[in-house]
Regions:
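Conserved acetyl-CoA pyrophosphate-binding loop and the N-cap/start of the following alpha-helix
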Residues: 91, 95-104
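A short, well-structured alpha-helix characteristic of acyl/acetyltransferase catalytic modules
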Residues: 1-48, 165-175
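Conserved catalytic-core motifs of GNAT/GCN5-like acyltransferases
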Residues: 118-121, 138-155
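Hydrophobic adenine-recognition pocket in adenosine-nucleotide-binding enzymes
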Residues: 18, 87, 121
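Conserved GNAT acetyl-CoA-binding A-motif
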Residues: 110-120
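Glycine-rich acetyl-CoA-binding "A-motif" of GNAT/NAT acetyltransferases
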Residues: 63-66, 127, 154
């Protein structure tokens, strides 16, 4: 288990530990068709932090807009982390996903000492790919038939990465 992540403050949002009071909202967000398409049906335990990372609520003025998580390899020979995020449909199109990813990227590079971050959206999830590219992630390959979600068919995912030396120090922390 990694140390608890502190509250991470962005310009319009904060990333904080999920509380039991957040679970109903996050379950409802995950059940929305626009989110379920990429994440599948919510299951028990989905809102527990991973053993080798953390799961954080995306809090906008006290409202839970979604969640963002990271899983890390802490072996000093590797020091990298993977990131995932979902936002409720009502929050789409406002730049909040980009800001949340940028805030977490800053933390993972500056505080956790990672040298490489990855994210792997479905190749058909063009808004997510644009969001991650705006933060600085670049495509490096396609993970063929990588995952199955709501429709149970295999889908390709785009592997994107961001290296610490390529990161522009929070260029996308806000709108």
């Amino acid at each position: 288990m990694v140390p608890a992540t502190p509250v991470l403050q962005g310009r319009r949002l904060r990333l904080r530990r999920i509380t039991p009071a957040d679970v109903a909202t996050l379950t409802a967000i995950r059940a929305e068709a626009a989110v379920r398409r990429w994440w599948g049906v919510p299951r028990a335990g989905d809102f527990e932090p991973p053993e080798d990372g953390d799961l954080l609520a995306i809090d906008v003025d006290g409202a839970v807009a979604g969640a963002i998580q990271f899983e890390e390899v802490t072996d000093p020979m590797y020091r990298h982390a993977g990131v995932d995020i979902f936002l409720g449909a009502a929050w789409h199109g406002r730049g909040l996903g980009r800001e949340a990813v940028a805030v977490l990227v800053r933390y993972l590079f500056e505080q956790r000492g990672h040298h490489r971050l990855t994210i792997d959206p479905a190749v058909a999830n063009e808004p997510a790919i644009r969001c991650y590219a705006a933060v600085g992630f670049a495509p490096v390959g396609v993970l063929r038939r990588y995952e199955r979600v709501d429709d149970r068919a295999w889908h390709d995912n785009l592997l994107m990465e961001l290296l610490a030396e390529e990161w522009q120090g929070g260029r996308a922390d806000g709108p």
